[in-house]
């Protein structure tokens, strides 16, 4: 939502996709209040037919797609193999693996493919931005998530090479620890330890990721790169 509001404040017309109609309506109104336009669309981005239909609906309402921000994502954290007292007690299930891959990787591919299709069909230039994560470098307990986030970063670079001839740019952003609702629910001592590991000594704000999105959108010569927004965590 923070990314949408940053763009709305610049007057953007926003098509918002989610599974929750109530949250979509709320976000759309906030975008309008911020100075832009907003309309919500319910769709499961892991399903090809739903992605194709929702982009058709967006074209019908807005005429064209100029920017796609691939931000949908879930986590199903688990060790690949968990061992206790020399005994294997759990393995990451195929359900845990596949659910994350379906949304975080396949969903990004489907939306990217559909957005590029519409841009080429309409003859308009555009930009596709994939939200990756610093977990793309590998993180304990996140085989599924790390694989997906590495994949979407690589896809952004691949698409930049494939789509440049159409005037379509592609890039990715890899956030570090961001003060989302999920992170804010952690114990205070855990949050303190996280911040100690960040050179800037704090977590990032969602709006700061939104500013990075706006930078990519507004920078016509920027493509094929992954911006790491992590407060210097990986220095």
Model-predicted regions and their roles:
Residues 1-15:
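Canonical Rossmann dinucleotide-binding motif of NAD(H)/NADP(H)-dependent dehydrogenases/reductases
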Residues 9, 36-37, 64-65, 119-133, ...:
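Active-site loop of short-chain dehydrogenase/reductase
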Residues 21-22, 42-54, 94, 208:
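The beta1-alpha1 cofactor-binding region of Rossmann-like NAD(H)/NADP(H)-dependent oxidoreductases
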Residues 66, 74, 87-109, 129, ...:
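Catalytic Tyr-X3-Lys loop
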Residues 75-98, 121, 141-144, 184-186:
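Conserved mid-core segment of classical short-chain dehydrogenase/reductases
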Residues 88-96, 129-151, 156-165, 178:
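Catalytic loop of short-chain dehydrogenase/reductase
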Residues 112-113, 157:
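A short, exposed helix-loop element centered on a Lys and neighboring polar residues
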Residues 202-229, 234:
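C-terminal substrate-recognition "lid" of short-chain dehydrogenase/reductases
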């Amino acid at each position: 939502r923070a990314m949408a509001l940053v763009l709305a404040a610049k007057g953007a017309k926003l098509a918002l996709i989610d599974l929750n109609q109530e949250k979509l309506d709320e976000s759309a109104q906030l975008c309008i209040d911020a100075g832009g336009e907003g309309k919500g669309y319910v769709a499961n981005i892991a399903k090809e037919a739903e992605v194709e239909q929702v982009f058709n609906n967006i074209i019908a309402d807005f005429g064209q797609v100029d920017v796609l921000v691939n931000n949908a994502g879930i986590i199903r954290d688990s060790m690949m193999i968990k061992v206790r007292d020399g005994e294997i007690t759990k393995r990451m299930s195929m359900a845990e693996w596949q659910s994350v891959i379906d949304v975080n990787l396949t969903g990004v591919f489907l939306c990217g493919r559909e957005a590029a299709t519409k841009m080429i069909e309409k003859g308009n230039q555009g930009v596709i931005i994939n939200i990756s994560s610093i977990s793309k470098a590998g993180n304990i307990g996140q085989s599924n998530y790390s694989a997906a986030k590495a994949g979407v970063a690589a896809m952004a670079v691949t698409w930049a090479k494939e789509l440049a001839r159409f005037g379509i740019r592609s890039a990715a952003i890899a956030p570090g620890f961001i003060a989302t609702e999920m992170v804010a629910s952690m114990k205070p001592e855990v949050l303190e330890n996280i911040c100690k590991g960040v050179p800037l000594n704090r977590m990032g704000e969602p709006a700061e990721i939104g500013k990075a999105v706006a930078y990519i959108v507004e920078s016509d010569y920027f493509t094929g790169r992954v911006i790491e927004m992590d407060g210097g965590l990986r220095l």
